[in-house]
Amino acid sequence: MKKILVTGGSGFIGTNLIEYLSKDTQYEIQNIDIVKPKISAQDKYWVQVDLRKHDAVIAAVEAFAPDYVIHLGARTDLNGKTLQDYDANMGGVSNLLDAIEVAGTVKRAIFTSSMYVCEPGYMPKNFEDYAPHTLYGESKVETEKRIKTANPFYTWSIIRPTSIWGPWFGEPYDKFFHIVLNHMYFHMGKRACRKTYGYVDNAIYQIMSILQAAPEKVNRNVYYLGDYEAYPITDWANEIAKIEGIHIPHVPYWCFKIVGWVGDFLKKFGIAFPMTSFRLHNMTTDNVHNLEPIKSVAPNLPVSRIDGTKVTLEWIHKYE
């Protein structure tokens, strides 16, 4: 039986990954996370560990003695005020690297970074070309640099999930669904954009494909994760609306600008609002990533966008 350690297994992607792994009898699973799992049936795999605590991480990894590590644990929100607020990402990966070395049992590891090591719309020249636009993105740049500098002896890869969505997701990627469902989405004509999104089951297929590929094919490589066809946002919104019987009206772009300014103003007072200038910029900026490297490892995605959308809507109606 192969032992797989998942960090951050109580998060969105982690919850779906644990669910997938738990159905395969060849794996013994452990999830180390600071928070409880979202699904109570996954409690048996969970050990409460704060990735920022060096000794606790070493103790947990050494005790489990994993064959494989999938590192998903991170702080992912954009609310931090300083880079140090994201030490779970930077110090966390350093602690994990130390722990894996101490354990001495790991054959492969996959470390999670983020597409936000570059701002939306920026196309990096290579995987050492960084252009973060948030503190979170800066923390993930530092995460990647620490892994590459350590250059561990085992087979390792870095993944950069794009806009992953599906059951058990949260802000910001659930916002799009809720905006459409609450009749708050409006088409903005030619300002609509195309982006790389990814259904969560497809992302898990990609992760597992990296884990199972020949070492020489994936070692020291960086991969963006996402569905292989970029999404025109207008088309996806129409699919959600059609399933739910919702009509989406068209509104001039300048109206969105005003609503974004209102959201900016309310944010200063700690009031959540579905639209801000930052979000509008993201909504109107093409952000299509090169997925050819991961496609060569994981060529056949298991779930179409429309099928994933139907499953996600069923989950929203059941759990939210």
Annotate each PLM feature.
Residues 169-175, 189-212, 220-221:
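Substrate-positioning beta->alpha
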Residues 4-24:
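N-terminal Rossmann NAD(P)H-binding glycine-rich loop of SDR-like oxidoreductase domains
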Residues 44, 51-89, 102, 120-124:
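NAD(P)H-binding glycine-rich loop region in Rossmannoid oxidoreductase-like domains
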Residues 257-297:
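A hydrophobic C-terminal alpha-helical subdomain
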Residues 131-157:
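Active-site Tyr-X1-5-Lys
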Residues 213-274, 303-305, 309-313, 319-320:
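Mid/C-terminal beta-alpha module of Rossmann-like enzyme folds, strongest
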